Amino acid sequence: MKHRVVGRRLDRTTEHRTAMLRNMVTSLLRHERIVTTTPKAKELKRFADKVITLAKRGSAHHRRLANREVKDVEVLNKLFDSIAGRFKARPGGYTRIVRVGRRAGDNADMSVIELVDRAAAEAEGGEEKAEQKTEKKAAKAKEPKAAKAPKKAAAKPKAKAEKKGAEE
């Protein structure tokens, strides 16, 4: 019976399952969007929401607790500095699961799990990136193009032909 048993086993041992979820939450926070199977995404949603809630509290104690789950220092800093600030007003539900169909190899049900405010964060960052791209294009247009260097590949077939002629 499964009375009062919470969570999924995902056909893994306890150690493997916790290691997998820690790696997945680190990837989710780094990229803010990952593609995985639907059962894994549902478990990851529970796990990631708990880690983000720790980051929202923001104390040194909560940073240490989150450090047990997030295995990369850069991602941990990103979590506490930027991601937690974006979710200050939201009481929960920090991730979204979108089903994307079935995997070709084994017909597994696949889903995208992403942070809810990812689109808003990309819009703010996207405007800055667009400005940077236009600046780079303008700088490239101003620079004169250099003359191309002569190719060495044309000399190689002649050398091979000479060697063959010398051998015969």
Swiss-Prot record:
This is Large ribosomal subunit protein bL17. Residues 121-146, 159-168 have a biased composition (Basic and acidic residues). PANTHER family: LARGE RIBOSOMAL SUBUNIT PROTEIN BL17M, RIBOSOMAL PROTEIN L17. Part of the 50S ribosomal subunit. Contacts protein L32. Residues 121-168 are annotated as: Disordered. The lineage of its organism: Bacteria, Pseudomonadati, Myxococcota, Myxococcia, Myxococcales. GO terms for cellular component: cytosolic large ribosomal subunit. HAMAP family: Ribosomal_bL17. Keywords: Ribonucleoprotein, Ribosomal protein. Gene3D superfamilies: Ribosomal protein L17. Pfam families: Ribosomal_L17. GO terms for biological process: translation. The keyword Membrane does not apply. SUPFAM superfamilies: Prokaryotic ribosomal protein L17. The keyword Repressor does not apply. NCBIfam families: L17. Residues 148-158 have a biased composition (Basic residues). GO terms for molecular function: structural constituent of ribosome. It comes from the Bacteria. Belongs to the bacterial ribosomal protein bL17 family. InterPro entries: Ribosomal_bL17, Ribosomal_bL17_CS, Ribosomal_bL17_sf.
